[in-house]
Design a protein with these regions (language model features):
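Conserved, structured core segments of small domains
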Residues: 1-95
């Protein structure tokens, strides 16, 4: 599993139109269950995604095609982790 930390690097590029393109692009990844969660950081300096893509390379390919990344408005870092504990609602994803 992966935690993706996205950071805004150019707020002037973060328009409602670009944000809609980003959300629409990622929608397919949620439908295929590759992305589990995503949302804004507080304060709004970027966002976080929780991914269960098959590999880091596959996740990187998805991220590099994201309109946020392609526009140069956002950078990202990926941390791989193994979930060992979860609430009852999420026991199915714990190793």
């Amino acid at each position: 599993m992966y935690l993706v930390d996205m950071t805004f690097t150019d707020m002037t590029k973060i328009t409602p139109e670009l944000t809609d393109k980003h959300k629409n692009y990622l929608e397919g990844e949620y439908k295929s269950n590759n992305l589990l969660f995503g949302g804004r950081k507080v304060p709004r300096t970027g966002g976080i995604l929780i991914s269960q893509h098959a590999s880091k390379r596959e996740l990187e390919q998805v991220l590099n095609s994201d309109p946020f990344i392609k526009s140069g408005a956002v950078t990202y870092s990926i941390t791989e982790f193994i979930p060992l504990m979860a609430s009852k609602a999420y026991q199915g994803i714990v190793a």
